[in-house]
Design a protein with these regions (language model features):
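Catalytic cores of nucleotide-sugar-dependent glycosyltransferases that transfer UDP/GDP/TDP-activated
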Residues: 1-220
Length: 220
């Protein structure tokens, strides 16, 4: 379902003021989490993991900023449609509102003067621009991030690797007949090129839920 434009957009000063309230002591660490939906509303395994991550982060006196696409998508955001992706921001479990990714990137750059340890963890890239996520990571003063393999979206827009949404395909080569016959085939070509560019531009530490998932992902 297509959502209308938000009535109000946060500015970088708004984000900075929320994370660093006047007169307060800055947290030692700010963890910025990239997710695909609102974990405070949607129930699921990924969302449960994010909830735990937020709890553990804030319990230690640190800050947790979660960014999800304002407009949910079944794929990556396309630059031609969304050159500056709109995201919904949640800070320590409290909704702040919506902002463009360029504003979030600017805020992250400003925050590093007060918070020395700003980290990015990617739970899901559905609806996001990987190019802007890379820019966000660089804005923290780091070239590294963590990325969870909750599924295989980094290998194909069909995150469960089901050809035409029916049968498991095993992430075959792009030139295969399987990709040529699949409704995700054309999108996968653009998708993989952008994923490769992300992994080239950022030092990504991959977190897998099992050895099987890690081995399968590395093999592809």
């Amino acid at each position: 379902r297509c959502k209308g434009e938000p009535e109000f957009l946060l500015k970088s000063e708004d984000l900075v003021a929320s994370i660093l309230p006047e007169g307060s002591t800055p947290p030692d660490t700010l963890l910025i989490s990239i997710v695909h939906d609102d974990y405070t509303v949607v129930a699921g395994g990924v969302q449960f993991c994010i909830q735990n991550e937020e709890y553990l982060t804030t319990a230690q006196g640190n800050a947790y900023l979660c960014l999800s696409p304002y407009q949910p998508l079944p794929r990556l955001a396309h630059d031609a449609e969304q050159p500056d992706v709109l995201v919904s921001a949640i800070l320590n479990g409290r909704a702040l509102g919506s902002a463009t990714m360029s504003v979030v990137i600017d805020a992250a750059r400003k925050i590093t003067s007060s918070i020395k340890d700003v980290q990015v963890v990617v739970h899901h890239l559905l609806g996001h621009s990987p190019e802007q996520v890379a820019d966000l990571i660089h804005a923290t003063g780091s070239d590294a991030c963590m990325l969870w393999l909750h599924d295989f979206f980094t290998l194909c827009p069909s995150h469960t690797l089901q050809r035409n949404g029916i049968s498991f395909c095993g992430a075959p080569p792009l030139q295969s007949n399987s990709c040529g016959l699949c409704l995700y085939g054309d999108e996968r070509r653009r998708h993989l090129a952008r994923m490769h560019a992300l992994f080239e531009s950022v030092d990504i530490n991959v977190l897998a839920p099992s050895q099987f998932a890690a081995d399968f992902w590395q093999a592809h």
